C-alpha cells in the first residue's frame, strides 16, 4: 500500500543528532533530501516537529516553572525548528510553508486547515509549529490532531529506534520488537510510543501509525511505499 497524504512527526531531539542540544545542519539536510524524493513522487507531506532539542515544557515544569508557561516556551522552540526545516527543505528544492498555532505573521502563516490542505494539493510541504496552541498537549497529540484535520492516510513517527519494543532496546539487549500492534495494545501497555491522547485520537479516526528509524537513509520513502519497516500501530490492514 502506498500512502498519498502523510503526517510526519519529528521529535526535536531528532534534529540535534549527536550534539546533545540545538540543531545539527547535517540532520536537517538528510531529512530534507529524503522528503524531496517522496514529494517528487507525488506524496503529499505535512510535518509536525517537536522542540525538545531546545526546550521541554515538562522539564521546565519539573524545575519549578508553571506548567502552562513552560509549555508555551516549548511551543516557541518548535517554531524555531519549523523555520529551520523550511529553510532546509527549500534549499533541497521543496516548496514549503510553515503554519503556526500561535500567530507570528512575520515568520509564518497562521494555522488554517483549508489553506494547509490547499498547500498539500499544490505539492507543497506544510510544517506545523507551536504545537496545537494550548498547554498540556504534546506534539504527538498535535500530530494526531493535524493528521485527522488534513485527512492524512497515516502518521509516521520517525525516531532514533527502528520500531516499538517491549522495553528500551538501548538499555536491554533482550528487548523484543513488535512489528504490529493494535491501538488497544499501546493504550493498555506502557510502551512509551506516544501519549494516550495521541493514540486515542488516531484510534477514533482510524489513522494508522508507523514508527521507524529516521536515521536510516531512505526510510521515509520506504514507509510511504508501505514496505514493512519499523512497527505499525492500528487495526489489521
Swiss-Prot record:
Documented EC number(s): 2.7.4.22
InterPro entries from the UniProt entry: AceGlu_kinase-like_sf, Asp/Glu/Uridylate_kinase, Uridylate_kinase, Uridylate_kinase_bac
Keywords: Allosteric enzyme, ATP-binding, Cytoplasm, Kinase, Nucleotide-binding, Pyrimidine biosynthesis, Transferase
Reaction equation(s) it catalyzes: UMP + ATP = UDP + ADP
Location of this chain's protein in the cell: Cytoplasm
Enzyme class: transferase
Pathway in which the depicted protein is active: Pyrimidine metabolism; CTP biosynthesis via de novo pathway; UDP from UMP (UMPK route): step 1/1
Regulation: Allosterically activated by GTP. Inhibited by UTP.
Chief localisation class: cytoplasm
Record GO terms (molecular function): ATP binding; UMP kinase activity
GO BP annotations listed: 'de novo' CTP biosynthetic process; UDP biosynthetic process
Binding site for ATP: 9-12, 52, 56, 159, 165, 168
CDD domains: AAK_UMPK-PyrH-Ec
Binding site for UMP: 51, 71, 132-139
Gene Ontology CC: one annotated term: cytoplasm
Domain of life from the UniProt record: Bacteria
Region (Involved in allosteric activation by GTP): 17-22
UniProt subunit comment: Homohexamer.
Family note: Belongs to the UMP kinase family.
Function: Catalyzes the reversible phosphorylation of UMP to UDP.
Identification of the protein by name: Uridylate kinase
Gene: pyrH
Amino acid at each position: 500500500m502506498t500512502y498519498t497524504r502523510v503526517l510526519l512527526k519529528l521529535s526535536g531531539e531528532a534534529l540535534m543528532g549527536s550534539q546533545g542540544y540545538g540543531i545539527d545542519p547535517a540532520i536537517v539536510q538528510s531529512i530534507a533530501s529524503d522528503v524531496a524524493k517522496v514529494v517528487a513522487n507525488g506524496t503529499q507531506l505535512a510535518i509536525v516537529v517537536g522542540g525538545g532539542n531546545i526546550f521541554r515544557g515538562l522539564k521546565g515544569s519539573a524545575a519549578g516553572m508553571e506548567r502552562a508557561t513552560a509549555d508555551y516556551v516549548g511551543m516557541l522552540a518548535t517554531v524555531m525548528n519549523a523555520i529551520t526545516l523550511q529553510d532546509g527543505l527549500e534549499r533541497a528544492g521543496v516548496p514549503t510553508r510553515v503554519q503556526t498555532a500561535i500567530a507570528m505573521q512575520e515568520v509564518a502563516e497562521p494555522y488554517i486547515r483549508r489553506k494547509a490542505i490547499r498547500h498539500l494539493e499544490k505539492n507543497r510541504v506544510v510544517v506545523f509549529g507551536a504545537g496545537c496552541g494550548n498547554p498540556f498537549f504534546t506534539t504527538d497529540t498535535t500530530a494526531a490532531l493535524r493528521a485527522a484535520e488534513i485527512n492524512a492516510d497515516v502518521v509516521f513517527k520517525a525516531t532514533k529506534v527502528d520500531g516499538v519494543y517491549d522495553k528500551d532496546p538501548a538499555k536491554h539487549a533482550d528487548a523484543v520488537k513488535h512489528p504490529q500492534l493494535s491501538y488497544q495494545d499501546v493504550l493498555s501497555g506502557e510502551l512509551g510510543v506516544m501519549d494516550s491522547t495521541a493514540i486515542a485520537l488516531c484510534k477514533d479516526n482510524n489513522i494508522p501509525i508507523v514508527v521507524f528509524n529516521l536515521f536510516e537513509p531512505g526510510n521515509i520513502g520506504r514507509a510511504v511505499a508501505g514496505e514493512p519497516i519499523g512497527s505499525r500501530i492500528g487495526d489489521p490492514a
